[in-house]
């Protein structure tokens, strides 16, 4: 029985890994496609009508520190030269508009959705079927639905 379960789980894992995008098993003999287009090399000067851009400092939203403690250089937003800003001077991070942001579902981070989906699918395949995984019904118990 244990060998049958092991074979089933192994086959399920291999099947799910084969279906994942980006695995080499489905693209043998084909050229690998880059995930991002290559960066364009700018010409020897700024294009007419395109202001030259200053570097943009980006920090993930979950890594921002409370107001007043962070590095002001990281909180500064750099805009295109040429008067594209509504307010003169550096702009500060005002803080989160949602006071309970930790209660919100944040979604996928670094591809963990695929891991969660695979884990859930494996659990569905391996879990005991029927009512064996639920509590037994006891009609005399006040906590039972029976």
Swiss-Prot record:
Modified residues (Tyrosine amide): 145
Disulfide feature: 108-113
Stretch list, region Disordered: 29-99
GO cellular component: extracellular space
An example Gene Ontology biological process: negative regulation of blood pressure
Subcellular location(s) of the protein: Secreted
Record has Secreted as a keyword: yes
Molecular function terms, GO-annotated: hormone activity; protein-containing complex binding
Required for CALCRL receptor interaction (site feature) positions: 105, 112, 117
Signal peptide coordinates: 1-25
InterPro entries assigned: Adrenomedullin-reg_peptide
Domain of life the protein comes from: Eukaryota
Tissues in which the protein is found: Expression was restricted to the intermediate and anterior lobes of the pituitary.
Propeptide: 26-96
Keyword set, alphabetical order: Amidation, Cleavage on pair of basic residues, Disulfide bond, Hormone, Secreted, Signal
Function: Intermedin/ADM2 is a peptide hormone that plays a role as physiological regulator of gastrointestinal and cardiovascular bioactivities mediated by the CALCRL-RAMPs receptor complexes. Activates the cAMP-dependent pathway through interaction with CALCRL-RAMP3 receptor complex.
Family membership noted in the UniProt record: Belongs to the adrenomedullin family.
Protein's name in the database: Protein ADM2
Gene: Adm2
């Amino acid at each position: 029985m244990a060998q049958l379960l092991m074979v089933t789980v192994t086959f399920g894992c291999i099947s799910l890994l084969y279906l994942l995008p980006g695995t080499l098993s489905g693209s043998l003999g084909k050229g690998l496609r880059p995930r991002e287009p290559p960066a364009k090399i700018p010409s020897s000067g700024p294009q007419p009508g395109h202001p030259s851009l200053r570097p943009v400092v980006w920090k993930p939203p979950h890594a921002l520190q409370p107001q007043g403690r962070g590095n002001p250089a990281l909180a500064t937003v750099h805009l295109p030269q040429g008067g594209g800003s509504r307010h003169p001077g550096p702009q500060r991070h005002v803080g989160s508009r949602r006071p309970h942001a930790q209660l919100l579902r944040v979604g996928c981070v670094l591809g963990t959705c695929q891991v969660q989906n695979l884990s859930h699918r494996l659990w569905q395949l391996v879990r005991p079927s029927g009512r064996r995984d639920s509590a037994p019904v006891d009609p005399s118990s006040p906590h039972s639905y029976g």
